[in-house]
Curated annotation (Swiss-Prot):
Membrane topology: Peripheral membrane protein
Cystine crosslinks: none
Coiled-coil spans in chain: none
Function: Part of the ABC transporter complex PotABCD involved in spermidine/putrescine import. Responsible for energy coupling to the transport system.
Protein name: Spermidine/putrescine import ATP-binding protein PotA
One Gene Ontology term, aspect cellular component: ATP-binding cassette (ABC) transporter complex
Keyword annotations from UniProtKB, A to Z: ATP-binding, Cell membrane, Membrane, Nucleotide-binding, Translocase, Transport
Subunit annotation: The complex is composed of two ATP-binding proteins (PotA), two transmembrane proteins (PotB and PotC) and a solute-binding protein (PotD).
Length: 349
């Protein structure tokens, strides 16, 4: 194991009956990083988290924690804690008692418990809430208590299984920022599970995109968004225009009946590829100046931008723009070479 890795998953396979949930999955998780397991329902992300936590056992493969294989170590002996979507707080205990519960089980001296609980209350911005009943708290406050209860035990890794899923959109966005701040203050590893692309892009140092029990791509939010490894990632992370094309040569691609400059190289000459263009990367120009040209067939106001469909003989293009366009009008679309992303063509996708 490399010195900066805290967890290694090596060839993890897990099945339930005839259904393979994880298929020979391997993953390195670094110390002090915020890593997100992202994917649709049933992709294996929560099962991966449970295997790390010790709540599930892999059929084969190794879970390595700080150079030690921990497959047979029970959850309560692993140096990590888990926060679930259902916070499982004790309703008969107040905020202080909930946070202190794990420390009391370990028979930590009362003065140290008091010190640690106060530190956690400050960390999660709940100072003064010590004596509040759990049921008197908002959803966001309950979540903060659950996080404090997990962190007060000083785990080296915090596992979070869709903890924001039950919150409304405004509170969810606020808690995304708060969670990232907490992780940065503590400097420990967070492993976060979600199906929400915005959550992953907002909080993560590293995103692991999963589908059907396999890792599709692993990288920074910028890499995942700007350079998707395949069609699944391109479609799952944000909105994309995906079209077939031909890589004519290094830095030269043909699609939509036109030839474009691009920044990609290393493909075979005349190789069939797929082109990804994000809707926000199109620029609307006069019809006669367009690299691509078409007719506006739909326009929807999305608040911060309009979503516009432009159709021509080859394709229907989706673009996001702050400018309005009339349905039926003819417009041109312009692209920078950096906005054209080339992917290997996958016949089975």
């Amino acid at each position: 194991m490399k010195d900066n890795n805290i967890i290694e998953l090596k060839g993890i396979t897990k099945s339930y009956g005839k259904d393979t949930i994880l298929d020979n999955l391997s993953l390195n998780i670094k110390k002090n990083e915020f890593l997100t397991l992202l994917g649709p329902s049933g992709c294996g992300k929560t099962t991966t988290l449970k295997i790390i936590a010790g709540f599930e056992t892999a059929d084969s493969g190794q879970v390595v924690f700080e150079n030690n294989i921990i497959n047979d170590i029970p959850p309560y002996e692993r140096q990590l804690n888990t926060v679930f979507q259902k916070y499982a707080l004790f309703p008969h205990m107040n905020v202080y008692e909930n946070i202190a519960f794990g420390l009391k089980l370990k028979k930590i001296p009362k003065d140290i418990i008091d010190q640690k609980v106060k530190e956690m209350l400050k960390l999660v911005a709940l100072e003064g809430y010590e004596n509040r009943d759990i049921e008197a708290l908002s959803g966001g406050q309950q979540q903060r208590v659950a996080i404090a209860r997990a962190l007060v035990n000083e785990p080296k890794v915090l596992l979070l299984d869709e903890p924001l899923g039950a919150l409304d959109m405004k509170l969810r966005k606020e808690m995304q920022i708060e969670l990232k701040k907490i992780q940065q203050k503590l400097g420990i590893t967070f492993i976060f599970v979600t199906h929400d692309q915005e959550e992953a892009l907002t909080m993560s140092d590293t995103i692991v995109v999963m589908n059907k029990g396999e890792i599709q791509q692993m990288g920074s939010p910028e890499d995942i968004y700007n350079e998707p490894a395949n069609s699944f990632v391109a479609k799952f992370i944000g909105e994309s225009n995906i079209v077939d094309g031909i890589m004519l040569d290094d830095f030269k691609v043909e699609f939509g009946g036109k030839i474009f400059d691009c920044v990609d190289k290393g493909f075979e000459k005349n190789e069939a590829i797929e082109v990804v263009i994000r809707p926000e990367d199109f620029e609307m120009v006069k019809y006669e100046n367009g690299m691509l040209k078409g007719t506006v067939t739909s326009i929807i106001f999305k608040g911060v931008h309009y979503e516009i469909e432009v159709k021509n003989e080859n394709h229907t293009w989706i673009l996001h723009n702050t400018k309005h366009a009339e349905i039926g009008s003819k417009i041109g679309l312009s692209l920078d070479p950096e906005s054209i992303h080339i992917m290997k063509k996958e016949s089975d996708v």
